């Protein structure tokens, strides 16, 4: 059983209620039909009820078991406006502005998550990552002990021996443009825990660079080296090393030459990139050239599960992210 099959089976065992903030969007509706048929989650769709039902009918989809919530007519909107005002009044929020903001589908969905009405939230087929993160950070905030929210991809690479038989986690590929050493350490620790709890693999974390163990010098290299030291200080139990070039991180023969004393080099299954440019480009290179399945971006670090989608996602991608969100809710990831 591969990872996706395992996640699906786990999701079915203890279904959670997931809210799709972009309920009127075609790919979300196709995904909703599949999710309901497979029994992966209980769904709430945000949007105009008539539009959603009309589109579903046109596409010959059965979403009758999904709840539809329209922020313009929902009985919860007034409560959410009042609660959001209380959360943000110290930042200058007014009740009038709050009433307007919670009618935005993303803010409405995030308040439903805060309220406990749903267990997880998925968005991003239409909206940007920033659109999703803003209400998430304002309303849900980060989990205890976590400094920043970050995003990772589960990469499943066919006919590949690297990582866990072709399975690797890439971070941060979605959120933080230029993380500091402290932030990189936080990303490494959070992604390692995610690898263990979500993917059931023992994490071996490589902090990537264009340098391996001092082969190059400079501020960019120092940032990664410092992140490794910070991580080891707070989590000496984690298998983590760096700075490592990609080939040294995943190829045992290269590792034997470049980093022979490393306990991670050649066997890494979690790759932490030094910044968002390298992370985002890196996952897309592997996805396109190696025909890899890229599942994500999955957000980590929120107090409750909130997940992003690529605007280029397929309905299948949405199904998988919803299943992962269910498992995150089950396991408190």
From Swiss-Prot:
SUPFAM superfamilies: Isocitrate/Isopropylmalate dehydrogenase-like. Its EC number is 2.3.1.8. GO terms for biological process: acetate biosynthetic process; acetyl-CoA biosynthetic process. Pathway: Metabolic intermediate biosynthesis; acetyl-CoA biosynthesis; acetyl-CoA from acetate: step 2/2. Transmembrane segments: none annotated. Its main location: cytoplasm. Keywords: Acyltransferase, Cytoplasm, Transferase. It is found in: Cytoplasm. It holds the Pfam family PTA_PTB. InterPro entries: P_Ac_Bu_trans, P_AcTrfase, P_AcTrfase_dom1, P_AcTrfase_dom2, Phos_Acetyltrans/Butyryltrans, PTA_PTB. One of its GO terms (molecular function) is phosphate acetyltransferase activity. Gene3D superfamilies: 3.40.50.10950, Isocitrate/Isopropylmalate dehydrogenase-like (3.40.50.10750). It catalyses: acetyl-CoA + phosphate = acetyl phosphate + CoA. The keyword Repressor does not apply. One of its GO terms (cellular component) is cytoplasm. Belongs to the phosphate acetyltransferase and butyryltransferase family. This is Phosphate acetyltransferase. The lineage of its organism: Bacteria, Bacillati, Bacillota, Clostridia, Eubacteriales.
């Amino acid at each position: 059983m591969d990872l996706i099959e395992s996640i699906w089976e786990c999701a079915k065992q203890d279904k959670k209620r997931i809210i799709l903030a972009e309920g009127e969007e075609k790919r979300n509706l196709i995904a909703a039909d599949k999710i309901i048929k497979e029994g992966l989650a209980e769904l709430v769709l945000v949007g105009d009820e008539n539009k959603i039902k009309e589109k579903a009918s046109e596409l010959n989809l059965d979403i009758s078991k999904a709840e539809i919530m329209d922020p313009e007519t929902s009985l919860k909107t007034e409560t959410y406006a009042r609660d959001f005002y209380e959360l943000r009044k110290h930042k200058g929020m007014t009740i009038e502005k709050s009433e307007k903001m919670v009618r935005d589908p993303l803010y409405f969905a995030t308040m439903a998550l805060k309220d406990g009405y749903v267990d997880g939230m998925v968005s991003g087929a239409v909206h940007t990552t920033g659109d999703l993160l803003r209400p998430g950070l304002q309303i849900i905030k980060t989990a205890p002990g976590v400094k920043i929210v970050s995003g990772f991809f589960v990469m499943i690479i066919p006919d590949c021996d690297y990582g866990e038989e072709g399975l690797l986690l890439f971070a941060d590929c979605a959120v933080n443009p230029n993380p500091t050493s402290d932030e990189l350490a936080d990303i490494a620790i959070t992604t390692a825990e995610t690898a263990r709890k979500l993917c059931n693999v023992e994490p071996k974390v490589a902090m990537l660079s264009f340098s391996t163990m001092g082969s190059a010098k400079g501020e960019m290299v120092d940032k990664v080296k410092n992140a490794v030291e910070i991580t080891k200080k707070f989590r000496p139990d984690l298998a983590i090393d760096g700075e490592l070039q990609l080939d040294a991180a995943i190829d045992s023969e290269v590792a034997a030459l470049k980093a022979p004393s490393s306990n991670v080099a050649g066997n890494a299954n979690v790759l932490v990139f030094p910044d968002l440019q390298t992370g985002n480009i890196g996952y897309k290179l592997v996805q396109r050239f190696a025909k890899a399945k890229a599942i994500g971006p999955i957000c980590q670090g929120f107090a409750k599960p909130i997940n992003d989608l690529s605007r280029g996602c397929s309905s299948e991608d949405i199904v998988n992210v919803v299943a992962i969100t269910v498992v995150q809710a089950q396991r408190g990831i």
